[in-house]
Each structure stands twice: as structure tokens, then as C-alpha cells.
Amino acid sequence: MIGHRISRLGSTIVKQLAREGYLATYGTKNLHRSYGHYLQSLPVVPRQARTSQEAWFLKSHKFCTSSTTSSENGDEETEKITIIFVDKDGEEIPVKVPIGMSVLEAAHENDIDLEGACEASLACSTCHVIVMDTEYYNKLEEPTDEENDMLDLAFGLTETSRLGCQVIARPELDGVRLAIPSATRNFAVDGFVPKPH
């Protein structure tokens, strides 16, 4: 989630610099999110169009953009797995999730009711999920001490509890079922339903 926000902020900065003439690019460059989704093409500014002020700025300030090589052409599909969210009412909601995305991000992108109040900074337990099958729980990396500290505060803690912001989609987790607890511990007013960030 935070990677996505940084990527959006970076692309906004690059667009603004290009629009104001502080950034010159040679050839068309693509900016990509970490999941390989196309964001935008930057305009081509010929070398002759530089003013002395632009030349000085570019000489004294370095800018760099990059993209993943697997998605530069935009024709390769990102590998995805299926994660099955089990909501508070017991309804199973299967979701396709790109490899490398957190469970919290996947929930927010698919309008699943998983809070994430601290925006994945390991400062709350509102993205608490319960891995329903021990087989899948054993495939996860061990939780860090920081995650365990936050899990101690989680509502309805179980032996297979994890924080959704710390569970990252990997091929071996294809088909994992994650239960969303019926409540969270947060300092919000009763009945308040926060919007995903």
C-alpha cells in the first residue's frame, strides 16, 4: 500500500516537473507501478528545446525513473494467485491477487471490509486476519517481533492469526482462506466504518 502511494507521488512529481519544463526526457519512457500496471507516457523533449535555465537545473539536479523489465512492453501479465476472504457473515469472497501484494492491499482494492488504520506501519492490529488452514499458515514466513506485539492487541486472537499488511501474496499461498474477525480494536467511534486508504 505504501509502495503504491510512493509510486503515485513519484509519478505526480515527474509529471509536474515535465510540465513546468524542469525535466527533459529523451525517447518515450513508461512509468510503472510495482505490479506492472501502465501509468503514463512522459512527453519527449528534444535536446534543442532546453533553455539555459533548464540546462543549469538539469546539470545540478539528477532525476531517474525506472521500470521493471518484465513489464516494459506492457504485454506480459502479472502472475496472480487466488485468496479467499471469509467475511463476518461466513460468505467466501475469492479475489485474484498479484504476487508481491499484501493481503491488506488486496482487500482494499477489492472492497473487502478489512480496516488497516495505521496504513501498514505495524502500529495497530485492525488488519488482523485468521488463516483458516494450518497447512497455509505453516507456509507463511514467521511473524516479526513487531507483528507479534501488535497481534497481542488483536480482537479474537487465534493460533493462526496474522496481520494482513504483513502477509504477502506468493505462489505457494494460492487458494488460502482468510477469515476476517467480527470486530477490531481501534479508537474509532462505535459504528464508524473507516474508508480504506
From Swiss-Prot:
Keywords associated with the record: 2Fe-2S, Biotin biosynthesis, Electron transport, Iron, Iron-sulfur, Metal-binding, Mitochondrion, Transit peptide, Transport
Molecular function (Gene Ontology), one example: 2 iron, 2 sulfur cluster binding
Cofactor annotation remark: Binds 1 [2Fe-2S] cluster.
GO cellular component terms given for this protein: cytosol; mitochondrial matrix; mitochondrion
Domain 2Fe-2S ferredoxin-type positions: 79-184
Domain of life: Eukaryota
Disulfide bonds: none
Residue positions binding [2Fe-2S] cluster: C118, C124, C127, C165
InterPro entries attached to this UniProt entry: 2Fe-2S_ferredoxin-like_sf, 2Fe-2S_ferredoxin-type, Adrenodoxin-like, Adrenodoxin_Fe-S_BS, Beta-grasp_dom_sf
Transit peptide: 1-35
The protein's required cofactors: [2Fe-2S] cluster
Record localization: Mitochondrion matrix
A Pfam family: Fer2
Chain's role: Associates in vitro with the adrenodoxin reductase MFDR to form an efficient low potential electron transfer chain that is able to reduce cytochrome C. Functions as accessory mitochondrial protein involved with BIO2 in the plant biotin synthase reaction.
Family statement: Belongs to the adrenodoxin/putidaredoxin family.
Name of the featured protein: Adrenodoxin-like protein 1, mitochondrial
Organism name: Arabidopsis thaliana
